[in-house]
Amino acid sequence: ISAISSISDMSMLSNDKVTSIFAEDVVSYVESLDVYSNPSFLIKGRSGLDFSFDIQITGKKSELVVKPFNVLRQNGIERFLFCMGDIKEAREKATGKELKSLAIINDTIEPPKNLINALEEYGTPTLLWSKREEEESKNLFKIA
């Protein structure tokens, strides 16, 4: 019986649940920064597809969409970059604001440098979760 109980406890930490816990931690962190944010932000792209972001932060001249990555993998980066390409122009036209993005990466396992470089090459700054309390990291959330 204790073996069955242990297996049941392990299922509580399945990948989807860990990802969800990390996303919740990111939302809590952003809320602690005293910025105006919207959790669970949904936006339609030029393709007609809907895309969701865990956080949207609005300013007068720009807005920031935040994507937490519990584990940084190429397929996740590809989906994210497609999403940003699909929504950016339409969103900027609709709001009259510049659309920016930020990737927050759980770095308990060191993320591949080439994937971080890919995000930054396409204009998405990255914040390593272990560095979130540094002033430079907090400044990433300050938008006009």
Question: What positions do the PLM features span?
Answer:
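Conserved mixed alpha/beta catalytic, RNA-binding, or beta-rich assembly cores of soluble enzyme
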Residues: N15, V27-E31, Q74
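A short, glycine/Asx- and small/polar-enriched loop/turn
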Residues: L49-S52
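Active-site beta-strand-loop-beta-strand hairpin of nuclease catalytic cores
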Residues: Q56-V66
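Active-site-adjacent loop/helix micro-motif of nuclease/hydrolase catalytic cores
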Residues: L72-G85, P111
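Short beta-strand/loop segments at the ligand-binding rim of alpha/beta enzyme cores
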Residues: T95-A103
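Domain-level recognition of nuclease-like catalytic cores that cleave nucleotide substrates
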Residues: A103-A144
